[in-house]
Amino acid sequence: MTESTSRRPAYARLLDRAVRILAVRDHSEQELRRKLAAPIMGKNGPEEIDATAEDYERVIAWCHEHGYLDDSRFVARFIASRSRKGYGPARIRQELNQKGISREATEKAMRECDIDWCALVRDQATRKYGEPLPTVFSEKVKIQRFLLYRGYLMEDIQDIWLNFAD
């Protein structure tokens, strides 16, 4: 740590760090708190910021006030991003829970998102296993396992074979 940064108040250093973290991508409040509490890698190894709990709360409040930190925006973008990567609603819910997002906020965002999960599950299955999808039981089980791992719901997975005859 340089001489000038060691003289800066802990609040200013935390605020600077929070803005740099949030400039890269949106984070949940819990993620930001965890990253702010983590030691900073300095020239001589990890260095702690000796900030009080009040400093952390002021930084979080400032980020909320100035629009840098918004859990609802984070949830909406996270759902869109993960669904584009081929993950289903169950897996997305689990990941949001791990990131400290409440179940109510997650369910609200899942209802508001405009994602056709049935189309996505079919797209994932055909991308991985080709068109037409196998009808042999052992192959169907393999596809179901893959799609369940990706976080899709069993009723959506079974619909791809029900609509297969169309």
Curated annotation (Swiss-Prot):
Pfam families: RecX_HTH1, RecX_HTH2, RecX_HTH3
Primary subcellular site in the record, as a coarse category: cytoplasm
Taxonomic superkingdom: Bacteria
InterPro entries, per the entry: RecX_HTH_1st, RecX_HTH_2nd, RecX_HTH_3rd, Regulatory_RecX, WH-like_DNA-bd_sf
Entry keywords, A to Z: Cytoplasm
Subcellular location: Cytoplasm
GO biological process: regulation of DNA repair
Keyword NAD belongs to the record: no
GO CC, alphabetical: cytoplasm
Keyword Cytoplasm: yes
Function per UniProt: Modulates RecA activity.
Family to which this protein belongs: Belongs to the RecX family.
Annotated HAMAP family: RecX (MF_01114)
Protein known as: Regulatory protein RecX
Organism of provenance: Shigella sonnei (strain Ss046)
Gene name tied to this protein: recX
